[in-house]
Amino acid sequence: MTTQNRHLSGKVAWVTGSSRGIGRVVADHLAGCGATVAVHGTTPTSARAFNEAESLAAVAEAIAAAHGTETLAVHGDLSREAEVKRAAAEIRARFGRIDILVNCAGGDIGAAGTGAADAGRPQRNDALNISPEDMQAVFDRNLMSCVWCCREVAPEMMARRAGHIVNFGSNAGLVGDEVGAMYATAKAAVTHYSRCLAAQLRRYNVAVNVVAPGTIVTARIIASNQVQPDRLNESGRLDRYGWPIEIARLVEFLVSDANTYITGQVLRIDGGEQLWPA
């Protein structure tokens, strides 16, 4: 059983893209803080990619068992509005509402999906040569999933005059880069959409912020051959890769009652990899 501070007790959190990777750790951490958590994957077996779990249901059950809180597994392609509405309806039918939305779903993953080479990264992955199919897949996975989920959840938060939305950007979305150009562009769009949404929702007391991670060690990142072994240092040094729990702690603050005056902001968490303004 968890020994964390249960300051999120009574809150219902939907963490998209939480069948594995950063999203799974965020969901687990929020549950440890007392939140009721809906975990999400594209399919019931999304968690099997990179051997992180047997099923989405198994992830939800493990989180519930670890922290003694209620969980629910929902699946769906969040780039499709109808599937977003269905997943949200399942959460509301079980828990009555959604207080917290964390949009972790995304990734530099093309049309072939995570089962392709390099963990699904598009093969011609630059601004001039990426295929139309891969480009659409990257934008759907990162931008449109975020837009549809925010549009679905924001109205009930506005009506209650309370709520927190955290969208996942990326350091890649704050700089130009030849490789992964469409992913960087999609994450830049997520960032600016979030600023626009924050401006619209602040009068309703709904906070919208962006977490922009640097390179965070997950099974997919390792499988995509992007990791330099000498930076896999878990000590207190900053010139290393980050770990999902470090992201989860930042999300915890942003969705808690301690956050009373932060909205529309991009919070880098990258160990100082980028030191210029967002």
Where are these regions (language model features)?
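Active-site helix of classical SDR
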Residues: 150, 186, 194
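Residue(s) in the substrate-gating loop at a strand-loop-helix junction
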Residues: 170
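Short C-terminal tail/terminal secondary-structure segment
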Residues: 2-4, 175, 252, 263-278
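Alpha-helical segment proximal to the catalytic Tyr-Lys
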Residues: 155, 199-200, 260
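Catalytic Tyr-X3-Lys loop
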Residues: 120-147, 162, 166, 190, ...
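Short-chain dehydrogenase/reductase
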Residues: 1-95, 107-129, 133-134
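A glycine/serine/threonine-rich, flexible loop-to-helix segment
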Residues: 51-52, 114-123, 182, 203, ...
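C-terminal helical subdomain
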Residues: 144-147, 203, 210, 230-262, ...
